[in-house]
Amino acid sequence: ILDGLVGSEMCIRDSHNYIRPGGVAADLPDGWQKDIEEILKIIPEKLQDYDDMLLDNPIWKGRLQNVGILTTEECFAYGVTGPSLRASGHSWDLRKAQPYSGIENFEFEVPVLNEGDVFARWRIKVLEIFESLKIVEQALNKMPKGPYKVQDKKITPPPRKRLDESMEALIHHFKIYTEGFKVPEGDAYVAIESPRGELGCYIVSDGSSKPYRMHVRGPSFCNLQALPVIMADSPIADAVAAIASLDPVIGDVDR
């Protein structure tokens, strides 16, 4: 689906820039419903097979259980969020605690485990995929018709096809991308529940079209800080499993 929206090269690089001020960059491609329906048929069965294969596998359990333990208190101390926090016994999920973008209209559970080890962090991710499939199915059935972006010309650039037809549209496009739009003076912090935890953005506006200050709170940067605690009194051979269980995005960590 992302390939149809933004092209295969951009999709692979995860730099599709699809979400824009006032909406999204483009409408969903033709046939997207059928593509999602096919995915919803394939993934649950395959995922269940993988889960059954690993859940009672003595080698898998022996390598991951009681390894890299992280307590709830340690998660709080280091700002660990997302599946890693929920694998340590705390049910914090922004989709439930601070609902946004209509997520409160979807039915899903927040899996919680108490062991706090590598096995629990793996297991939480599997359980959350099952819940995500429920959300996707509900979104497919509830998807409304209508515009995919606001029509306020101060925020939204003109359709690209008009750039070859209208000088006014070309000027409008140029001003939007060179000057931007003015934001009222003030500050705000908004966070969402990303696959790895709390992903937030703090922004300060001085009333101009350029932010006075902006900071992105990425989950991987915070989660990986707990690695020394996770690895305390553990052999170096456990490091690979411990890091993988946190599932960090290195681009978020390397600042």
Predicted regions located by residue number:
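Metal/cofactor-centered catalytic core regions of large enzymes
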Residues: 1-3, 8-255
